[in-house]
């Protein structure tokens, strides 16, 4: 993409920490206190995430649209994949004028954006998440891109997880502990929940070791 450096991409290291949260709003305090929603593993969620390809959601007053452009296991075609690879695309409908300069001729030329029917400049970010985690925590690396902040990645990933819970209500529901009956169905009331994820930054182990063993030992 023309607005990015053609020779390198910044990559940051992170952790995805999985948990669950209630979707059902009207619950007795007893059910809220005793509800124990099982936390799915990423390996279990991976095929459901892949099924959400092409899902989009708008942010920043509808000026930035994030899309799950692609989602695949890595290595591709492996019977025992080790990672989940996601491609997030961002369409920026609020792009500014681009200036092209010719140093030889000492001229500048403006390229005015002409957005039609929701068009915008597009950026992309790859996310590689390990499928083997410990204590609900999964290592990940993210290729950085303009407009796609860590906070937006976390928000969009959780929006995808929410869509998964809506599309798979039987999988993400448990019986209420009080065994209350739903008056509309006559069946035991179900408590709906959703998987959620927190995106955390991680310590650079190489830098940490240098800080403790060499010339950076006084840095805190």
Residue map of PLM features:
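Well-ordered mid-protein domain cores that form the structural environment of catalytic cofactors
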Residues: 104-124
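Elongated alpha-helical scaffolds
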Residues: 118-143
